[in-house]
């Protein structure tokens, strides 16, 4: 019986923490604007007049984007650096995030990205638009 009281108290504390967190979202301005989140939620068929829920989705989205960017950076750092012969270029150690790095990071989250065909790789490049078979 004591176990039931403890779990009830823990549930009450969780509910109170959730209520407090949702209330704090009213004073928070997320990185991703409310209008943008509302647009994509509506596009997916979700309508909600509660700003707190929209901001909760914005915070979750922001965290997802930050996690993917961090993972992509780790993939970028793990990639072998190209051999540079010029001493000036050796001092410049900027990392270049590639689509391959981003694809690997997204794949860890179950998102498969197809690389778009480059315009220059298209068989119809340089052809008259009227004669293209695309």
Swiss-Prot record:
It comes from the Eukaryota. One of its GO terms (cellular component) is nucleus. The keyword Cell membrane does not apply. Keywords: Activator, Nucleus, Transcription, Transcription regulation. It is found in: Nucleus. Pfam families: TAF10 (PF03540). One of its GO terms (biological process) is DNA-templated transcription initiation. Expressed in roots, stems, leaves and inflorescences. Expressed preferentially in the vascular bundles and bundle sheath cells of cotyledons, the phloem of hypocotyls and the central cylinders of roots. Induction: Up-regulated by auxin and cytokinin. Overexpression of TAF10 results in salt tolerance during seed germination while knock-down mutants are more sensitive to osmotic stress and display several abnormal phenotypes involved in meristem activity and leaf development. Belongs to the TAF10 family. TAFs are components of the transcription factor IID (TFIID) complex that is essential for mediating regulation of RNA polymerase transcription. Involved in osmotic stress adaptation during the germination stage and in gene expression related to meristem activity and leaf development. Component of the TFIID complex. TFIID is composed of TATA binding protein (TBP) and a number of TBP-associated factors (TAFs) whose MWs range from 14-217 kDa. Can homodimerize. Interacts with TAF4, TAF4B, TAF8, TAF9, TAF12B and TAF13. This is Transcription initiation factor TFIID subunit 10. The gene is TAF10.
